[in-house]
Amino acid sequence: MSTFQKFIQYYKPYKKVFIFDLICAAFISLVDLAYPQILRSLTKTLFLKDASMILKTLPIIGGILFICYIFQAFCKYYVSCQGHIMGAQMERDMRRKLFDHYENLSFSYYDQHNTGQMMSRLVSDLFDISEAAHHGPENLFISLVKIVGSFIFLFIIQWKLAIILLAIVLLMIFFSAKQNRKMQATFLDNRRKIGDVNASLQDSLAGIRIVQSFANEDIEREKFRVGNEAFLDSKRDNYRAMGSFQSGNTFFQGMMYLVTLLAGGYFIALGQMSAADLAMYALYIGIFISPIQILVELTEMIQKGMSGFIRYQSVIDIESEITDSVDAVNMKHPDGDICYHDVSFSYEDNEIVLNHIDFTIKSGKSIALVGPSGGGKTTICSLLPRFYDITDGLITIGGQNIKDIKLESLRNSIGIVQQDVYLFGGSVKENIAYGNPDATFDEIVEAAKKANIHDFIMTLPNGYDTFVGERGTRLSGGQKQRISIARVFLKNPPILILDEATSALDNESEQHIQKSLDALSENRTTITIAHRLSTIQNADEILVIDGQTIKERGTHEELIASGGLYAKYYHMM
């Protein structure tokens, strides 16, 4: 399916509105085309009769035209109002589809793309698409009706002159097609550059505390200046192409007026055309050129819209790597044993991260992963909820292959507490309720109490309704961590992943958080990643991950006694 065919698919839900919009556009054009012809007919017939006949007939003609102009005004309102609403609805549909698609894309996509570019597609590109979606077909239809209609009348009045004008129009079309290709290339480049600017801006503002703490404002300004200048250079190329396009078309339009004047005068001199016909010709030339000017402006709009749509469609066409299998079902035994059978994993660059990993976690038991950074600990945890799919091997929960489990069911059964806590820019209550959007307020409070954060929340100005700031900037690291723990308490999953949940906290905060984590882990199958070995000594089993594989396994006491890597790490504390 071509890009154009994909684009027109979005008109289907609004087919009736779209068709009536075009009918109204046609009526608007036909009324404008009719007036010069009526005036020409009156000049050659009625106005040559006696005064009584003129005075008797004019009110009838005037009344008919008055009714036509009333209907034309109604049509203009419909086109201007409902047509724009249709465009806005299409923009909404595309934005919703794009956002839904973003939500379904796997982690690997986000590993390779930045937020600024994604925001540019959601906002700037879709606005241009919306403008083209409404104004494009409507203005194109009006313009074509006027151009074809006026040319027919020009041909009827003086066909020789019409043929000369047609030659100029064909030259104009050839010139426009050539310039269009240049314009589309510059518009696409322009969209990429504004995406880069948005990405740079988003990155700098999101990290403003780091920027200011290192006094690196000048570095960020320079990075932004480079991107901004690149955008300006792209705009210059864009406007040069547009300038050539518009100036060339203006020249051809001027040639039409000049040819009409010279050739029209020549045909009058030969007696092949009357002065009245030349006057009508001038009126129709105005009607003929006006839509050409609209088409010139419309070309720019359509090029912007189609450039935006190409970028939009480039994302929509990306298939998520992680999807439900055709026969996927809900998880049958969420409290069953978790087994990694000969699991291997590598990223797209084929760098091996895990190499033939085997281990089992009994239901309700805990396992801890330790080892150097980059050894694959976080990857092991990311494979369980299928943030990434394994390259080889098998992972089962309760004997059920996780690839045969619906993603929603799988992920609803797993709670994750991470080192880098993300809080949304809402209230404390909303952030805790993210673990279970259907929870009652009493259930939210109970989860907060279990996470040892309730008393602190009650000291806030608005309690649970207090705004936490973007990414929770108004809260300390320990406070954010306890809210994230409350969120998981509310979710109440049978499986728990603790990914270095206390590594970024001070000792006092760690002690408070560890109590909350111990309570959270009770009676749940738990996987813990930790650098601080003091937090995992009570784990039922500890795995030492190094060199993409399991080097050691056992309890804390067994590993200390063996004197291997774990004992070495422990004595370095």
Residue ranges and their predicted role:
Residues 18-75, 155-160, 271-275:
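Transmembrane helix-loop-helix hairpins at lipid-water interfaces of multipass membrane proteins
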Residues 22, 26-37, 66-77, 129-132, ...:
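Hydrophobic alpha-helical transmembrane bundles that constitute the permease/transmembrane domains
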Residues 88, 96-126, 199-223, 227, ...:
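Short intracellular "coupling" helices and adjacent cytoplasmic loop segments at the cytosolic face
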Residues 16, 107-108, 124-133, 137, ...:
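An intracellular "coupling" helix at the cytosolic face of ABC transporter transmembrane type-1 domains
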Residues 13, 17-27, 65-68, 135-189, ...:
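Transmembrane helices of ABC transporter permease
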Residues 2, 11, 79, 83-87, ...:
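Juxtamembrane loop-to-helix connectors within ABC transporter transmembrane domains
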Residues 48, 54, 63, 153-167, ...:
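Helix-loop-helix
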Residues 324, 331-573:
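ABC-type nucleotide-binding domain
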